[in-house]
Amino acid sequence: MRTHELKIRGIYLFDIICNGKRFELRKDDRGFEVGDTLWLREVMDGGYTNRGITAEITYILRDCPEYGLQKGYCILGFDRYDIL
């Protein structure tokens, strides 16, 4: 199991924390696996803020062009998260 440090814009971090968003659409270039940890760090004006979350990947959707998911991208699902 690995930890993937990723940038996230504030509006999308807000949606996770306040509006129940439980997925991320990402380039599938890091070898994501169910059970891995996402470390989503908020970025603003080109730098990191002190806000973010960690979450365990519980589902991965890949290679579904019939539903509009382009090759090379994936949707990462997670249930629970911890605010940093």
Put a short name on every predicted segment:
Residues 2-84:
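Catalytic phosphate/metal-binding cores of nucleic-acid and nucleotide-processing enzymes, i.e., regions
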